[in-house]
From Swiss-Prot:
NCBIfam families: PRK00110.1, PRK12378.1, YebC/PmpR family DNA-binding transcriptional regulator. The keyword Transcription regulation applies. GO terms for cellular component: cytosol. InterPro entries: Integrase-like_N (IPR017856), TACO1_YebC-like_2nd/3rd_dom (IPR048300), TACO1_YebC_N (IPR049083), Transcrip_reg_TACO1-like (IPR002876), Transcrip_reg_TACO1-like_dom3 (IPR026564), YebC-like (IPR029072). This is Probable transcriptional regulatory protein H16_A0916. It comes from Cupriavidus necator (strain ATCC 17699 / DSM 428 / KCTC 22496 / NCIMB 10442 / H16 / Stanier 337).
């Protein structure tokens, strides 16, 4: 099954994340804290905590930092009380954007998100205005050249929903969100460690941008990503090289 070219977009996002490692750690600590607070400190019974710890370890976060975040979440240490908020909005040409936040000050966060949208040619929508354009799923992306048949066999055996080969040769595997950790472990045991693996809001359709519009759209996405309270930004925009 063929899909759109997205390897360049994934590489851009990964490079940007690597460039701001300290900020990534801050976001992951907040996520671990909230996951532990909501579901307890046992990773065997808390899939969200297991996922956030996996991401922290992939980002080379020291185990002491991870443990302190868990303790803070379950009440062993003082820490900020974060709440989860999702904002939805539009970029250029009506491109859909979802902004997931963890914040201890809702008023500050909504003002910053709204300012980023308006400054860069977008606008905020109401709750539910674009979320229906996305599917909540586990996503694994493999570089062009990965053996497709072997990966497909391993993925389907692991419990994946779909395996898609994109136009650029990269391969995308998706699975139900709750099965993410099990599928990830099974794929890695079979020798397939993904370049990017996460639980995401995957767009059902995509909008391509090139030239000046691509640059403007990227500025909007970067402005949202760089806000301290923002954890994740999802969009159906595809930025062409």
């Amino acid at each position: 099954m063929a899909g759109h070219s997205k390897w360049a977009n994934i590489k851009h996002k990964k490079a940007a994340a690597d460039a701001k490692r300290g900020k990534i750690w801050t976001r992951l600590i907040k996520e671990i804290t909230v996951a532990a607070k909501l579901g307890g400190g046992d990773v065997d019974s808390n899939p969200r905590l297991r996922l956030s710890i996996d991401k922290a370890m992939d980002a080379n976060m020291p185990k002491d930092n991870i443990q302190r975040a868990i303790q803070r979440g379950v009440g062993g240490m003082e820490g900020a009380n974060y709440e989860e908020i999702r904002y939805e909005g539009y970029g250029l040409a009506g491109a859909a954007i979802i902004v997931d936040c963890l914040t201890d000050n809702r008023t500050r966060t909504v003002a910053e998100v709204r300012h980023a949208f308006s400054k860069h040619g977008g606008n905020m929508g109401t709750e539910g205005s674009v979320a229906f354009m996305f599917t909540h799923c586990g996503q694994f992306l493999y570089a062009p050249g990965t053996p497709e048949d072997k990966l497909m066999e391993a993925a389907l055996e692991a419990g994946a929903d779909d395996v898609v080969t994109n136009d650029d040769g990269s391969i995308e595997v998706t699975c139900p969100p709750n099965d993410f950790s099990a599928v990830k472990a099974a794929l890695e045991a079979a020798g397939f460690k993904a370049e990017v693996a996460d639980v995401v809001m995957k767009p059902q359709n995509e909008v391509s941008f090139a030239g000046d519009d691509a640059a403007k759209m990227q500025k909007l996405l970067d402005a949202l990503e760089n806000l301290d309270d923002v954890q994740e930004v999802f969009t159906n925009a595809v930025i062409e090289d």
